[in-house]
Amino acid sequence: MLSTRSDAQELAQYQWKHRVIILCGDSHSDSYQKQLNMLSAEELDAKFADRKLILIKDSKEHCDDVFKIMLYGLDGGMKLSSSTVVKAQEIFDLIDSMPMRRAEIMRRNGKS
């Protein structure tokens, strides 16, 4: 799921419903475009849905950095902040290592 953040949205609206990736900075920078292309690949839609993950694009006016990617967990806490491009699989692996995600997987697999 991809949305555009044109003004300062509250992360609280996503808490306990979605994990959130925020991509912010100069949307014309190489890093921003590379990260956006990596995370917008159609083949990742199922992985995003399975992890309750959404991607929000933020404009430079809300971000002092040329490029920054941030990941927030279901609890609303920041789990990752980077000014360099992060591979999608690294993000998925990080999420999959989180206790809430591991509990989701166990419930889905019928294990308590």
Q: Residues of each region from the PLM?
A:
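Non-catalytic interaction/Regulatory regions outside core domains
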Residues: 1-112
